[in-house]
């Protein structure tokens, strides 16, 4: 995807898999998009580079991502259960978020998942303290971190819901 904006500004503007009751565990409230550190922006660029291939939904399907649910403000959630483990891997998100658009699916964000059995506290995530891991108690208890790397979210890169995502249908 080409941008007319300088890359750092474009990345700063670009701003998540399991729905249900959540508890925000960040020490800060939603960081303003332009408050992200250079290190966080570099890591977000790595996530974008690694997931760009999933703009083609057939690639996500072939790589094992399967539909889980539609969550208002998050979109259609697809999870690759085979990569859910105790590790936070920027380049291999366990979840992808899509929205229906023009008779296809548009990639809007990623989600990282770490089972609660791996750590009682939020996992180390992106550099800095702007990411917000959430404890999800329903179903498989997990820590979840969403990043709206493909659809800007004026509420913050790591916010759970993006007001620009249409309601589930």
What name fits each language-model region?
Residues 7-8, 85:
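Generic detector of short alpha-helix boundary/capping microenvironments
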Residues 8-20:
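Bacterial N-terminal signal peptides
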Residues 29-169:
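Primary mode marks residue(s) on the alpha4-beta5-alpha5 output face of response regulator receiver
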Residues 20-32:
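Sec-dependent signal peptide cleavage junction
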Residues 1-6:
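Positively charged n-region of N-terminal signal peptides that target proteins for export
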């Amino acid at each position: 995807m080409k941008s007319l904006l300088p890359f750092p500004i474009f990345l700063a503007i670009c701003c998540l898999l399991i729905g249900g009751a959540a508890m925000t565990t960040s020490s800060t409230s939603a960081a303003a998009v332009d408050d992200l550190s250079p290190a966080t922006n570099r890591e977000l660029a790595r996530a974008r580079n690694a997931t760009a291939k999933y703009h083609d939904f057939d690639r996500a399907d072939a790589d094992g991502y399967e539909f889980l649910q539609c969550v208002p403000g998050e979109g259609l959630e697809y999870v690759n259960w085979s990569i859910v483990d105790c590790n936070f891997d920027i380049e291999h998100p366990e979840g992808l978020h899509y929205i229906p658009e023009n008779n296809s699916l548009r990639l809007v964000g990623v989600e990282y998942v770490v089972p609660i059995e791996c750590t009682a506290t939020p996992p180390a995530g992106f550099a800095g303290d702007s990411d917000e891991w959430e404890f999800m108690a329903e179903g498989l208890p997990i820590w979840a971190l969403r990043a709206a790397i493909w659809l800007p979210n004026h509420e913050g890169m790591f916010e759970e819901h993006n007001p620009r995502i249409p309601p589930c249908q």
